[in-house]
């Protein structure tokens, strides 16, 4: 039994190692398809006009690509198991071989399937975040991600967990919360939104855009969310199918236009020198980080060029 447990433990570790080697990161997958679809060549207005289509196409293309890669990944792991005792299958029919293989490696097969399921769930959220960030960049909306600024800027750990982006940035959030917006990306809604509303009230932030693809938000939840200054943002197709009569649900195109108008309020703002230097250092770091992703690098170079220190 101990030997079997060790074999299973070793196989689980092999899954982890091979997954990190064979599967691209969620961002890399999305960015590759972003360029493949030619969005990196589009102008700013294209993103304002077609954000919903861009998001749908990027999601679909990334899913198609991912399934191909995951299939090859799973194939390699099953081959790894088969190679351990391939001699035992030589004189068997295909049916006999499959029966023996599945019987002998039930735990390993389950471990791989479970790992694939968990990976899909995790990747779906991260890919969605990457898509939204690229759309914001394409529309030339200034923002920073929670990952680039850390959670310390927010009043509570609960709020920090929910916020993915701050428009236009952490400096502005500290200087004047009423002229900033928080963006939370969730493929589906599972949070306890009453608590989120309480957190929002304490921050004095103007609003939170809850970006989602959830097609089954109840009327009760929509009313609760609206009460707490949280605006649902989704694609035009999801609105047409599910939320035509919901005033608190807007399209990605609507959100981009609202954010653009909000950013105008920061033109000619008298920033403290320390905040400007912090912004400059952040953008320089991000330019280096995304040196191999020209579209992203160009976005941050543009943001940096707009800073007058």
Task: For every predicted segment, state its role.
Residues 91-109, 163-166, 187-199:
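Short, composition-biased local secondary-structure segments
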Residues 1-97, 306-309:
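Nuclease-adjacent, charged terminal/linker segments that flank catalytic cores
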Residues 84, 91, 150-152, 190, ...:
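Short acidic loop-to-helix transition motifs that present clustered carboxylates
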Residues 106-153:
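Acidic-basic catalytic patches of nuclease active cores, encompassing PD-(D/E)XK
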Residues 145-173:
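Active-site metal-binding core of divalent-cation-utilizing nuclease and nuclease-like domains
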Residues 215-308:
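Domain-level recognition of nuclease-like catalytic cores that cleave nucleotide substrates
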Residues 176-236:
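Catalytic cores of nucleic-acid endonucleases
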Residues 123, 127-131, 160, 188-195, ...:
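Short, well-structured alpha-helical interface segments that form or flank functional binding sites
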